[in-house]
């Protein structure tokens, strides 16, 4: 009754007994799998692959016609190898618009042309409305503090002003960063945005 049990080790978890079924027992009657192997890659390889996958995801999520986002921080055109040429490369070669004009338009107003912004125009306008109403109410409260009026408290304007300003600023910044493809900002995280 006091039979000594062998100690359980991590290798025992990878043994397949005859009852478990499987590919078939080895000569010892118990099928064994090979040791666990975890592949470690160099940090720069992972970072480069992560950057490429982010660019691909950004293209799928944030670009209507599949144009590749520029990896250059100043908005310049990056160099690409021939295996990654864009569909739009032929369109760019025939373009009569100068690159500086195109770049200035892209940095200024391109986020308003995003397909998800067009589709959710009401939500974007509501975010801007919250922002503007909050600012107006706070400015009225500041004006009442500067020139007090009997019977009217500035707190009546400050409290609703901050209650409207905070979500307005949050949503406007979040929408802008999601369109620009900043890491951590995606339309998926805004539940009232139709995808």
Curated annotation (Swiss-Prot):
Residue ranges, Extracellular side: 144-154
GO annotation, cellular component aspect: cytosol; membrane; perinuclear region of cytoplasm
Source superkingdom: Eukaryota
Record region (Disordered): 1-33, 48-88
Quaternary data: (Microbial infection) Interacts with Hepatitis E virus (HEV) ORF2.
Assigned protein family: Belongs to the TMEM134/TMEM230 family.
Protein name: Transmembrane protein 134
Gene label: TMEM134
């Amino acid at each position: 009754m006091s039979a000594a049990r062998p100690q359980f080790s991590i290798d025992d978890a990878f043994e397949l007994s005859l009852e478990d079924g499987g590919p078939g027992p080895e000569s010892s009657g118990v099928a064994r799998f090979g040791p666990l192997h975890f592949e470690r890659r160099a940090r720069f390889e992972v970072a480069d692959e992560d950057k490429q996958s982010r660019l691909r995801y950004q293209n799928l999520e944030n670009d209507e016609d599949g144009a590749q986002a520029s990896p250059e921080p100043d908005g310049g055109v990056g160099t690409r190898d021939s295996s990654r040429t864009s569909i739009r490369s032929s369109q760019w070669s025939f373009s009569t618009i100068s690159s500086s004009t195109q770049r200035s338009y892209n940095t200024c107003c391109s986020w308003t042309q995003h397909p998800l912004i067009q589709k959710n125009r009401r939500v974007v306008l509501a975010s801007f409305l919250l922002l503007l109403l909050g600012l107006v109410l706070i400015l009225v409260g500041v004006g009442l503090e500067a020139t007090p009026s009997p019977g009217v408290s500035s707190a009546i304007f400050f409290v609703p002003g901050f209650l409207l300003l905070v979500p307005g600023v949050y949503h406007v910044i979040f929408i802008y960063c999601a369109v620009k493809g900043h890491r951590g900002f995606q339309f998926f995280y805004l539940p009232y945005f139709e995808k």
